[in-house]
Amino acid sequence: MRSLFFLFIVHLLALGSGKAVFKNGVSQRTFREIKEEIANYEDVAKAIINLAVYGKYQNRSYERLGLLVDTVGPRLSGSKNLEKAIQIMYQNLQQDGLENVHLEQVRIPHWERGEESAVMLEPRIHKMAILGLGSSIGTPPGGITAEVLVVASFDELQRRASEARGKIIVYNQPYTGYEKTVQYRVQGAVEAAKVGAVASLIQSVASFSIYSPHTGIQKYQDGVPKIPTACITVEDAEMMSRMASRGNKIVIHLEMGAKTYPDTDSFNTVAEITGSMYPEEVVLVSGHLDSWDVGQGALDDGGGAFISWEALSLVKDLGLRPKRTLRLVLWTAEEQGGIGASQYYELHKANISKYSLVMEADSGTFLPTGLQFTGSDKARAIMKEVMNLLQPLNVTKVFSNGEGTDINFWIQAGVPGASLRDDLYKYFFFHHSHGDTMTVMDPKQMNVAAAVWAVVAYVVADMDEMLPRS
């Protein structure tokens, strides 16, 4: 009875949390009035936090995630595993009591790595750990045997272009942060091919390594020959750099069975809590369901997808119904360049004026430190007030750069966007590697992440007005 009374009070607080004043259809509210409206959500926010972090549903997102990734495993674009996961999630969301659960068809790339190996033949025999990069071609039958040229940058490759023809280029670039260093993974094959190389091997884009290669997407360029490309461990890249500096001749035999097949059908997975007053207006909450084909895809991006599901579950379990529709989208084929999100945008952009906020969790679900946000100054000021509701968790900061692969389409068109900001210290230890498993995940940290995500999504969806764009 006490819990029912508490939920009744939560309902009253939600419904009576503010009243807009309009003149000629244009809001005349002061920021002070908006601030007071948001402050009235304090008890609702505490109810969400208590349920997610301390209450009946603590650890639920972790347990749900573990069941999926232990059952299905990794979920590469075009794979049977991904489609199995999508069907499981479709059933899960229906069983959870969410509304308008449906699948939206998407055409996605289908690439498979096949068998792959690399062996150093000179100056000594050494079997190397490699992971072919997404969309890479395979080697010819029997593989490639070639001498190695080690470079530390694209500039060095250009300076030594006369030495590169017929060689395997090994990039031993220093790690200077993911955003800067990832260019070698994405463009390494193209730049090597331009100077006549027969293959490229790139030091894994990782902040720490225990002899672990890390995969990811790479992109060919029209008019440039396609050559096989893979990532190698930090340890092997650095070793070959040392060997080269001593004047050693390095020879590698590389075999890659990678193949690209015709595009295939997949689906974005959608579920909602329909808005009570403005059902056509939307706060979108998202993560991607696909992963690479190594590890379990728990970190990237199982955690983000499942705290996004949990956000809607928590709102539903408290009996809350926001004024606007809360829409969950689990993207497909994010790792291939946001394919599912791109097609979703094309399908729904006619309603762009109805999107108040687009949210994406795709940077891990370690302990949150705040929210990254992109939007107008007025919208940022409002988001700072919303984040103040999370003082019980000490997660109140609003950072810049709310962009994410799957929501950038909307942000570039002027829709406010937010990404979860958390402690990334360990993220790139495991990112796109065999180490991306449930062992990396922490249920208590996921609880906090889910609470943050749910509070932000619900409050923005329930406020009297959409977030301002200018």
From Swiss-Prot:
GO cellular component: cytoplasm; endoplasmic reticulum; extracellular space; Golgi apparatus; lysosome
UniProt entry keywords in alphabetical sequence: Carboxypeptidase, Endoplasmic reticulum, Glycoprotein, Golgi apparatus, Hydrolase, Lysosome, Metal-binding, Metalloprotease, Protease, Secreted, Signal, Zinc, Zymogen
GO molecular function (one): metallodipeptidase activity
GO terms under biological process: peptide catabolic process; proteolysis; thyroid hormone generation; tissue regeneration
Localization, UniProt: Endoplasmic reticulum; Golgi apparatus; Lysosome; Secreted
Residues of the signal peptide: 1-18
Quaternary structure and interacting proteins, as annotated: Homodimer. The monomeric form is inactive while the homodimer is active.
Function of the protein: Carboxypeptidase that may play an important role in the hydrolysis of circulating peptides. Catalyzes the hydrolysis of dipeptides with unsubstituted terminals into amino acids. May play a role in the liberation of thyroxine hormone from its thyroglobulin (Tg) precursor.
This protein's name: Carboxypeptidase Q
Species of provenance: Mus musculus (Mouse)
Gene: Cpq
